[in-house]
Amino acid sequence: MKEIYQTLIQSQDRSYYIGCSDTSMVVGNWKTKTFEKWWLEKLGLNKNKLSNEAMKAGNNYEHKILDSLEIKELEKDKQIIKDRLRANLDGNTNACIYEVKTYNIAKEFKVSKQYWRQAQVEMYASGIHKLYIVAYGLQEDDYNNYFNEIDKNRLKLINVDYDKKFIENEYLPKLKVLTECLKKGGFPEW
């Protein structure tokens, strides 16, 4: 399978590729309106312009959070393409992936099923089977001022173990079907 590595993510267009953050859609129920809307986006027939203040803040703080880890050899924004699977890694070394997640500090951070699934596919796509979610709690002022310094006391590194069975038994069979449907421009059946 041909792999393409890029170090700069140049487009926010999510059509024609299946990303790691799409994993819950890949392994979920394909007979819903939500799936249909998502699949139309993948086929390039619908555009998702979802953005909110929390997403904007997370995107703006991502590199500062990674820099605050002070990890030598840290690469940012690596993109890996395997056929129709596209993995965008926030940060990585040759031995570990660092996936940044920001959250409102007033709430406790938990690794959701969606985040866990995304992490699994990032590890699969990259071949790097060690991953930390770097959770950073944002305070109210952080949403209004993206120039605030990173407070290391608000950083949490949470290990996510690689689950080969999930990838082989749940993810890859469905990814294969979706990849073929993307190439043919049709809807999948499972």
Give short role names for the model-derived ranges.
Residues M1, E189-W190:
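C-terminal end-of-chain micro-motif
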